[in-house]
Curated annotation (Swiss-Prot):
Positions in coiled-coil regions: none
GO biological process: 3,4-dihydroxybenzoate biosynthetic process; amino acid biosynthetic process; aromatic amino acid family biosynthetic process; chorismate biosynthetic process
Protein name, UniProt field: 3-dehydroquinate dehydratase
Record's signal peptide: none
Family of the protein in this entry: Belongs to the type-I 3-dehydroquinase family.
Positions of 3-dehydroquinate binding: E30, W31, R32, R62, R186, S205, Q209
Entry annotation: catalytic residues: H118, K143
Encoding gene per record: aroD
Function field: Involved in the third step of the chorismate pathway, which leads to the biosynthesis of aromatic amino acids. Catalyzes the cis-dehydration of 3-dehydroquinate (DHQ) and introduces the first double bond of the aromatic ring to yield 3-dehydroshikimate.
UniProt cross-references to PANTHER family, sorted A to Z: 3-DEHYDROQUINATE DEHYDRATASE
Amino acid sequence: MKIVAPVMPRNVEEAQSIDVSKYQDVNLIEWRADFLPKEDIVSVAPAIFEKFAGREIIFTLRTSREGGHITLSDQEYVDLIKEINAIYNPDYIDFEYFSHKAVFHEMLDFPNLVLSYHNFDETPENLMEAFSEMTKLAPRVVKIAVMPQSEQDVLDLMNYTRGFKTLNPEQEFATMSMGKLGRLSRLAGDVVGSSWTFVSLDQASAPGQVSLADMKRILHVLESED
């Protein structure tokens, strides 16, 4: 299971002062560009990609529709993603599928998509349908993060992940049940077929994230042969 950690600078000075040594035990860097004003994202990008040269980067523009910090029209959203991709070609690009389905056709030629769905309010009853629709599109990664209201919600998310991974072994999934209640799903991803787990360093980017230090200890125990 790969460990993903966010970088969330709010200006170019913060981007330039990122301590990359904190990320040495991380497999993937997620640049949460939505912590910046829209007009600053392209100008801050060089600092991010230079800081993490040689590392795998996920470009994420989490909008207010899915718990993020920026409000964009569908066209603004896809245009900004395409601009960053054209210049920097990040290893992965997060695309909020259900929130921006109207412009998804503009992303069909992109081989590095993380199709994502986030629900910070609940674990919806149609979660299985969301899994199915996104999996059929065969992106690099299907990412689903939902908020549980019960233990059963957590188990449902994990069971759906296991089921869809079994039926689609070549498809990568990154799924999590958020908040304290859902923390188990972040720790047991390998068991159910979730390839990524998101951790926090100085600041969490989503509820229920485990710190990098704790995650390393837990994974060491889970992956130990003894």
